[in-house]
């Protein structure tokens, strides 16, 4: 498509701002930023890879904000980070070798999966926290990273559920670890799609900056907003989006 207009860039920036805030509070922000790129006319694969690149600064900011909770977790970050990098590379390679028609066919299902993860994450975390066998952790993180490298929406939710299932740890420390692993997945995916994918760089730059601002604002207000209501609002929006995408 042609270069986006100033109004379209403003729209994408606003969507990324909101997505950054939603990610900081409840997760699932890509369910806002990805369809915004579709709405201004980008094909699904181009929209997805652009969204992957735009997410990187937000993940970096979130990881920096959790640096205190990451203290003492260097070994976990290195070991699981390596697993995440391999999974992200595999998922991104799969994405770059998927035709637009095939990707269009699976996107509605991926959006519904992200919605389901967002809906059940609190219940899942409480029900299985620390109960999964430790040996499954790397396998589950790998699968989560493959998903994140391929699509991205719901990555943080999936990783947090996986970590909570395998590690009996304080939720804030798990959230910090989740953020670090998400950053690894985002960086690996962004480098790969930046080199080989149809990234729309101008929108990606605008959205990246806006997502950082949204993430900071969301983090500052997270304790005062009804996260549950926001979570269900995003889920409802995502279900409608999946239906619209399926009927396109």
Can you describe what each PLM-predicted range is?
Residues 6, 10, 49, 102-112, ...:
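Alpha-helical transmembrane segments of integral membrane proteins
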Residues 1-43, 128-182, 205:
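Selected transmembrane alpha-helices and immediately adjacent juxtamembrane segments
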Residues 1-9, 38-46, 93-104, 194-202, ...:
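Helix-coil boundary and interhelical linker segments in multi-pass alpha-helical membrane proteins
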Residues 49-102, 186-229, 233:
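Selective hydrophobic functional segments
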Residues 17-21, 36, 63-64, 89-93, ...:
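Alpha-helical transmembrane segments of multipass membrane proteins
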Residues 14, 18, 53-56, 60, ...:
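Hydrophobic residues within alpha-helical transmembrane segments
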Residues 61-71, 109-133, 240-248:
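Transmembrane helix exit motif
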Residues 57-62, 112-119, 162-167, 212-218:
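Alpha-helical transmembrane segments and their membrane-interface exit regions
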């Amino acid at each position: 498509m042609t270069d986006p207009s100033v109004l379209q860039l403003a729209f994408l920036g606003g969507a990324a701002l909101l997505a950054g805030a939603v990610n900081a509070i409840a997760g699932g922000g890509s369910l806002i930023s990805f369809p915004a790129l579709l709405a201004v006319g980008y094909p699904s694969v181009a929209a997805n890879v652009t969204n992957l690149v735009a997410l990187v600064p937000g993940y970096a900011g979130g990881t920096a904000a959790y640096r205190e909770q990451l203290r003492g977790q260097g070994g976990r970050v290195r070991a699981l980070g390596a697993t995440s990098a391999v999974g992200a590379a595999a998922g991104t390679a799969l994405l770059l070798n998927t035709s637009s028609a095939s990707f269009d066919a699976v996107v509605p299902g991926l959006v519904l999966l992200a919605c389901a993860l967002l809906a059940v994450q609190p219940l899942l975390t409480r029900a299985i926290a620390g109960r999964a066998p430790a040996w499954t952790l790397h396998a589950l993180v790998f699968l989560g990273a493959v998903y994140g490298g391929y699509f991205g929406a719901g990555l943080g939710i999936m990783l947090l559920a996986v970590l909570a299932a395998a590690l009996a740890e304080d939720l804030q420390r798990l959230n910090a670890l989740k953020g670090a692993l998400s950053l690894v997945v985002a960086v690996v995916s962004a480098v790969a799609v930046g080199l080989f994918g149809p990234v729309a760089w101008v929108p990606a730059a605008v959205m990246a900056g806006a997502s950082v601002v949204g993430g900071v604002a969301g983090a500052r207000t997270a304790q005062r907003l009804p996260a549950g209501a926001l979570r269900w609002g995003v889920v409802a929006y995502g279900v409608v989006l999946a239906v619209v995408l399926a009927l396109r």
